[in-house]
């Protein structure tokens, strides 16, 4: 599901809201999560999951095309850990749809 598909789905479920209102709400939620992570804060949505940041140490990597070794700097990356309710819902959904994650996502 893309952001525009999410907006369309929420708009269909909430006909009293305009598409612009739904788009503003969705964008604001994403912005707030991004801003919190940029500050180093943890974002927990009970039952859904938690967004955190993880530090990746500097390392020596390899260019897959040339085989040349390259230095990869330390970096911070966003990380999502699914909550129990989300994991259970996904697992129940994939079992009902033939047992694959692709079946549950429609792809």
UniProtKB/Swiss-Prot annotation:
Residues 87-107 are annotated as: Disordered. It comes from the Bacteria. Belongs to the bacterial histone-like protein family. Keywords: DNA recombination, DNA-binding, Transcription, Transcription regulation, Translation regulation. InterPro entries: Hist_DNA-bd, Histone-like_DNA-bd_CS, IHF-like_DNA-bd_dom_sf, IHF_beta. Pfam families: Bac_DNA_binding. SMART domains: BHL (SM00411). The keyword Transcription regulation applies. HAMAP family: IHF_beta (MF_00381). One of its GO terms (molecular function) is structural constituent of chromatin. Heterodimer of an alpha and a beta chain. This is Integration host factor subunit beta. The keyword Transcription applies. The gene is ihfB. Signal peptide: none annotated. CDD domains: IHF_B (cd13836). One of its GO terms (biological process) is regulation of translation. The lineage of its organism: Bacteria, Pseudomonadati, Pseudomonadota, Alphaproteobacteria, Acetobacterales.
């Amino acid at each position: 599901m893309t952001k525009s598909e999410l907006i369309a789905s929420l708009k269909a479920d909430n006909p009293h809201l305009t598409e612009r209102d739904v788009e503003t709400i969705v964008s604001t939620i994403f912005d707030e999560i991004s801003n919190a992570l940029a500050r180093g804060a943890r974002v927990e949505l009970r039952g859904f999951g938690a967004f955190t940041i993880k530090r990746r140490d500097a390392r020596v990597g390899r260019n897959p095309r040339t085989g040349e070794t390259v230095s990869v700097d330390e970096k911070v990356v966003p990380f999502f850990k699914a909550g129990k309710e989300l994991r259970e819902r996904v697992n129940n959904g994939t079992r009902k749809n033939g047992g694959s994650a692709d079946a549950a996502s429609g792809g």
